[in-house]
Amino acid sequence: MMNRYNETGTIINFSARTYMNHKCICTYASDDEKLHAIIDDYGVMYSPDGKRLLDTVRQLKHYEVPEGVEVICDGAFCFSGLESIKLPDSLLAIGCNAFGNTRLTALTIPRNVRHIAPVNPIATNQLLLDKFECLSPYFKVVKGILYSKDNVIFYGAVTEDYPEELEILEGVKAIANGAMSHRAHLKSVSIPDSVTVMGDGAFHCSGVKKVKLSQNIDRIPAECFDDCRLEVFIVPEGVVNVDDSALGHNDNLITVIFPKTLKNMGYNVFSGCPSLTRISGPRKSNFMNLKDLQKAGLRKGVRSTRENCIIDSYDSNREGVTMHLHN
């Protein structure tokens, strides 16, 4: 699986696009497009034919996108300060993080929208919407959660009435990037075995304490459970990769259990986890050693609640966690 960053800093996880069974529309605005763009009186940038809204070049509070616009590109209104927006019926596609870090309180998805990039459209907003209306037959809202109509893609929370104990619908195959990011009221999540792909930062900075993971995923993505309230995290058999900062900054995390299938562990996987006292993994694993665990975020000389534990059973003078090895 290959990731890239777009110009707004949003990680785009391309594997999630596999599950778009309707027509994918390009929402990326290239530098060349912006070089030849037309800028209106509000500082909003358009392609020369007026069909693609590319970006904003200054702050604005209220805006009406004109009829004829078919695509709102990745990050187009991100950090714009936008408080309200009206979208046209001509709109077909909404890009990654198009309305992230704005002050929107309401949003209506027009009836002809057939493509929303696999990122929660308000993923980086600290506050959820008071009102979200979806007129498109390609999507639906269930208890404050946006899904594709066929349940294949879980986009995440869009309004405050999302459940504290979340059970993602059976049949979902992909969880969008940033799906439940910054959703402080979330306490637990149950992910069905139909899910095969989770997006980067899917539960980042949420209040989740307990997770039931799908048994059919092969990766814990970057920052997926970073800055949560987890106490125990069991990585399912079949997972091959745990990416950078996947479990970082969980102050209450005590135990992490890795499977035999794990082959790669990223940087800072559990950096900033002061309560971590147990890491369990297979005896023959190539990562259950001091060097790789330090790469993953365990640093020598860090004073914490694990100061009486050891990081390596061959050197009792090192502070850290006890490794539990099993066959």
Which residue ranges define each predicted feature?
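Structural signature of tandem-repeat unit edges
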Residues: 1-45, 51, 56-71, 79-93, ...
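Short glycine-/acidic-enriched loop or helix-start segments at secondary-structure transitions
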Residues: 96, 118
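Short, well-ordered secondary-structure "scaffold" segments embedded in the functional core
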Residues: 120-122
